From Swiss-Prot:
Disulfide-linked positions: none
Biological-process GO terms, alphabetical: fatty acid metabolic process
Matches recorded under Pfam families: 3HCDH_N
UniProt protein name: Putative uncharacterized protein RC0842
InterPro entries the record matches: 3-OHacyl-CoA_DH_NAD-bd, NAD(P)-bd_dom_sf
Gene Ontology molecular function, alphabetical: NAD+ binding; oxidoreductase activity
Amino acid sequence: MQNKIKKVCVIGAGVIGSGIAALIANSSYKVVLLDIIAKDSDDPNKIVNTAKENLHKQKPPPPPLSFPDKANFITIGNLEYDLDLIKECDLVIEVIVEKLEIKHQLYNKIIPYLKEDAIIASNTSTLPLERLKENLPDNIKSRFVITHFFNPPR
């Protein structure tokens, strides 16, 4: 299978997830950054908005985003209203809490939105690949990998 990655989705806008999104944007690739809706805000994208804004100023230096205009490569959204954004992505990188049950819930939620040949990756440091792939359809299992970006991603 030949696969050319043109657009990436990163799910999880914490320090590592937003850092991965910045790394991708720094390479002039389009990236979608998604996270949950903040419970304490009327803005459904508060978490990802804050993460994107902080990419210019995180410490230690250098900040994750090399140049301010690279932020234009990042589209933000949330996991309630913006799942359709996943349909455009060739690679989906999950960077959420290290709890198997929560990861499985997320995978089940996003599977209907995956492109037929999209690669799905978990940026885990503790969970085995076979456990992550449990109960996934066979056509997804064959495209599921583990990535491991260190903190901070650069």
